[in-house]
Amino acid sequence: MIPLLLSLLAALVLTQAPAALADDLKEDSSEDRAFRVRIGAAQLRGVLGGALAIPCHVHHLRPPPSRRAAPGFPRVKWTFLSGDREVEVLVARGLRVKVNEAYRFRVALPAYPASLTDVSLVLSELRPNDSGVYRCEVQHGIDDSSDAVEVKVKGVVFLYREGSARYAFSFAGAQEACARIGARIATPEQLYAAYLGGYEQCDAGWLSDQTVRYPIQNPREACYGDMDGYPGVRNYGVVGPDDLYDVYCYAEDLNGELFLGAPPGKLTWEEARDYCLERGAQIASTGQLYAAWNGGLDRCSPGWLADGSVRYPIITPSQRCGGGLPGVKTLFLFPNQTGFPSKQNRFNVYCFRDSAHPSAFSEASSPASDGLEAIVTVTEKLEELQLPQEAVESESRGAIYSIPITEDGGGGSSTPEDPAEAPRTPLESETQSVAPPTGSSEEEGEALEEEERFKDTETPKEEKEQENLWVWPTELSSPLPTGLETEHSLSQVSPPAQAVLQVGASPSPRPPRVHGPTVETLQPPGEGSLTSTPDGAREVGGETGSPELSGVPREREEAGSSSLEDGPSLLPETWAPVGTREVETPSEEKSGRTVLTGTSVQAQPVLPTDSASRGGVAVAPSSGDCIPSPCHNGGTCLEEKEGFRCLCVPGYGGDLCDVGLHFCSPGWEPFQGACYKHFSTRRSWEEAESQCRALGAHLTSICTPEEQDFVNDRYREYQWIGLNDRTIEGDFLWSDGPPLLYENWNPGQPDSYFLSGENCVVMVWHDQGQWSDVPCNYHLSYTCKMGLVSCGPPPQLPLAQIFGRPRLRYAVDTVLRYRCRDGLAQRNLPLIRCQENGLWEAPQISCVPRRPARALRSMTAPEGPRGQLPRQRKALLTPPSSL
């Protein structure tokens, strides 16, 4: 028994010896150490864009050595550790300091070397990527010591817009929107700090100082940075408080608990609201979700939020969740980042419960990827270029299209679109069929080029890949801004055909576009317009009115002839005969050339034709009755002996031109004999002009100061006008043909800056609408203009055809030329003119068979007796009846 006890005692002594020996060695080491570095905190929190002091003090364990024993200053080194990276921030010895270039002007040792025991670091302009571990090391002689602390930078900047439209907030509305989602409007310093941390967003948004900016990491043709070709925060400067933009919001603290609710079958928006209320919570706001993501929340499950959006936070992205970048992902209906899912679709929900412990979120929720097969992001770049420095640039753009794919088909989907703002990246080769869930409609769409990039807090990363996409149920509609009545709804998609039926709805500042070769769109209750267009994506008009069916392709004008022999006319083949009108035939004919004679000139006194509205004669009480002009609607006042007379522009009549004889089409606005329609969709000058021509119009021409004020005040955007010098440098012409009778150039314009191809003209609305010449490939909004009176397609003749491609409408005084078919000879005048009453002149051309060469030689025979012509020649010169 005793030997057993002795052996156990010996074993116990042996096991305790190493620990005791280690403690003795540690105690001896501490006694030998001259000093110890202490930070005194396990974690520090800083605010985005602010400054943070990281304390670090040197505690001497024995009296410090004399200067003779340890000459010089201690060496101080601060190091940043994040993952596997270790970066020197600062190294200092006395007055000699070496700072890493990435931290230049941002770090300092405020007390050192005046105090050798205080080596605290101050880090300013905090960025999101400043979060990590900071290590403080001090070395003096042969002694050294170090300590570390974790730093967390809280606060996140994100772009916010409501689902109805882009650029919908005034400055006051932007502040209210951020407050409504549990955030506040960001400051310029916060946005700049987010940019320095890698944030990029190609959308112009309000900031707290009433400026409009957006951050760009990779300048490109779609989005420029601080300067031409350089990254930075693009700054529009201080703009008017009533201008409309998106807003950059800032969220910081989450004063409560945010958790994911994922019941079986998922929830509609109203069911999601009730789900949170039953658990003593409420639907989380967008700002709260961003704050939770900034605090570490990672959920690969789209869920409802209070504003009707569907989002999910990703910290660790993967191919099936988030693409390749972290951030809060948002599901949109349309490529221009608008349209939230229908509230009848089913998703999970993010709930928020107030708590006494801030910055807490539930980790005990259901699995992160419950029921989620994949999250696919489909993106197409929307091109937008900046304006030169003199004319503040146009709004920037982005394009993000996120579609969840679920097993039960209830996760929602979307209608693919082809953004007209990016015509330079055709992707017709990347097409595939879309597989719909059970019970939903079928659609054959076009898969856009994919980028693994979402709406928020990440840098774009392109990756071409095709995926199968679900289609949104037919109940979905495109949300419209407040005050707009009707909605667009999609129905069944037909098999491949050659037309796209499109429906116009109530006027929208940015009308949606439906893409696909065969999309059938149902018209909502009320009036609308229905147009048949060729295969391809076309813009849905926003006008309302009685239905109008047209079969003429809306294509660009092309040189060449188009036969009018076959096919019925779109208008009745009747016209009012008005007799022969002599028109000078151009010496050099050009196929498809339209000759305009200035119908858009309102103030120019032009003698009316027989069919024009002359107006009456009013008795003048005294001279000078034309100042101010009593004539309405752009009429010209002429003083006469017995009074004055008003010459009315086409479409108006009456003594004072106050009687409307013609009216603009639905969706077009009248002014002084012309109709105008504004498009907020950004296009290059050539694309905008082509779109206007497809509508039977042109980019607006400005012929009077009154017209300048109308266009600039009515449509308060940077916009193209029809003026250009694309043909001859310095020779500016209007695209619709009238002479240049009025100018409103900015000082120093046009300048064709360094011959950089500034051949098109933009109206800068905030500078009283003054004009500047800019490159034609900028993407701006535009206004189309057509005459109040116009003619339809020209009369069809069986043996003749019109030069050029027929159009839907022709302006008054447009002159067209017929030519006879091959083998026929032309007789009589081949020209017709569009009259002021909207009818074409009666064609006078006659086409007869050509005579053989022998018959032509006989025509040159000498005259017969008494000066008479040969009978055969006389018969040939007898004009035939009109064909």
Swiss-Prot record:
Residues 1-22 form the signal peptide. Keywords: Disulfide bond, EGF-like domain, Extracellular matrix, Glycoprotein, GPI-anchor, Hyaluronic acid, Immunoglobulin domain, Lectin, Lipoprotein, Membrane, Phosphoprotein, Proteoglycan, Repeat, Secreted, Signal, Sushi. Its main location: secreted. Brain. GO terms for molecular function: carbohydrate binding; hyaluronic acid binding. Residues 441-451 have a biased composition (Acidic residues). It is found in: Secreted. GO terms for biological process: cell-matrix adhesion; central nervous system development; gliogenesis; hippocampus development; neuron projection extension; regulation of neuronal synaptic plasticity; skeletal system development; synapse maturation. One of its GO terms (cellular component) is axon initial segment. The modification Phosphoserine is found at residue 413. Residues 622-658 form the EGF-like domain. The keyword Membrane applies. Residues 428-440 have a biased composition (Polar residues). Residues 389-574, 859-883 are annotated as: Disordered. Residues 156-251, 256-353 form the Link domain. Residues 789-849 form the Sushi domain. The keyword Glycoprotein applies. O-glycosylated; contains chondroitin sulfate. Residues 35-154 form the Ig-like V-type domain. Residues 658-786 form the C-type lectin domain. Glycans are attached at residues 129, 336, 413. Belongs to the aggrecan/versican proteoglycan family. May play a role in the terminally differentiating and the adult nervous system during postnatal development. Could stabilize interactions between hyaluronan (HA) and brain proteoglycans. Isoform 2 may function as a chondroitin sulfate-bearing cell surface receptor. This is Brevican core protein. It comes from Rattus norvegicus (Rat). The gene is Bcan.
